[in-house]
């Protein structure tokens, strides 16, 4: 009798594949308008960026993705600011051309969707009916002027420069993000473990294309492709 493939075991939702959300800080979105003071800088599990613990005059606590150069007891402002400084959160319409911003909202009020990884930022290019930004990928994208963003670069730019050195350290890092530390090809498995497994040499042994309505356990390979991928051309 065959065994469940990895996709089926992941869908079952066991602890091996489930993200340890009890260790995470939750969704980090923009707080309400006001003046906040940085109370602490936290190294959050599951993230490659530090997180700021901020508090306002009403003693309301919020979390914010840290910017480069942040320090404890620093004041930051959130709202409609005419001349924003590094670390302030305001509308794209108020941020001058040539500025770098991060944690950019896709639509006004969603809390930030773009440029949230360590060391990244987008460049404000021009203003008009929409604000044009150059993203880290090199793509120019237009945003609504009422979308908010944080001025500056995200901290932790050297996160990827530090060598991991030990396999165990890498496994623990990936486990904090609920990712598998390795990938095994289907053709390298036994026939009992995968539809592509088995045989005297590594080969699929059947058409690798599968339809959209294929049942779980057989739905492996190229899913409903528009055309066949040709190698060596």
From Swiss-Prot:
One of its GO terms (molecular function) is structural constituent of ribosome. GO terms for biological process: cytoplasmic translation. One of its GO terms (cellular component) is cytosolic large ribosomal subunit. Residues 194-233 are annotated as: Disordered. SMART domains: Ribosomal_L2 (SM01383), Ribosomal_L2_C (SM01382). Residues 219-233 have a biased composition (Basic residues). Keywords: Ribonucleoprotein, Ribosomal protein, RNA-binding, rRNA-binding. Belongs to the universal ribosomal protein uL2 family. Part of the 50S ribosomal subunit. Forms a bridge to the 30S subunit in the 70S ribosome. One of the primary rRNA binding proteins. Required for association of the 30S and 50S subunits to form the 70S ribosome, for tRNA binding and peptide bond formation. It has been suggested to have peptidyltransferase activity; this is somewhat controversial. Makes several contacts with the 16S rRNA in the 70S ribosome. This is Large ribosomal subunit protein uL2. The lineage of its organism: Archaea, Methanobacteriati, Thermoplasmatota, Thermoplasmata, Thermoplasmatales. The gene is rpl2.
């Amino acid at each position: 009798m065959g065994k469940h493939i990895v996709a089926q075991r992941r869908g079952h939702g066991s602890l091996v594949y489930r993200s340890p959300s009890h260790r995470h800080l939750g969704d980090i979105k923009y707080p309400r308008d006001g003046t906040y003071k940085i109370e602490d800088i936290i190294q959050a599990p599951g993230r490659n960026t530090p997180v700021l613990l901020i508090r306002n005059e009403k003693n309301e606590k919020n979390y914010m993705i840290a910017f480069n150069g942040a320090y404890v007891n620093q004041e930051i402002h959130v709202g409609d600011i005419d001349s924003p400084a590094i670390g302030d959160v305001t509308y794209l319409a108020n941020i001058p051309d040539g500025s770098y911003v991060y944690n950019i909202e896709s639509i006004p009020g969603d809390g930030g969707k773009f440029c949230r990884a360590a060391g990244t930022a987008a460049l404000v290019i021009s203003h008009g009916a929409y604000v044009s930004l150059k993203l880290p990928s090199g793509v120019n994208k237009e945003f609504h002027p009422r979308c908010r963003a944080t001025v500056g670069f995200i901290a932790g730019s050297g996160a990827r420069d530090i060598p991991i050195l030990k396999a165990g350290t890498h496994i623990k890092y990936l486990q904090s993000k609920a990712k598998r530390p390795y990938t095994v090809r289907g053709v390298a498995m036994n026939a009992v473990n995968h539809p592509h497994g088995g045989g005297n040499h590594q080969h699929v042994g059947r058409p690798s294309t599968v339809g959209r309505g294929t049942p779980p356990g057989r739905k492996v390979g190229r899913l409903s492709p528009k055309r066949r991928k040709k190698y060596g051309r």
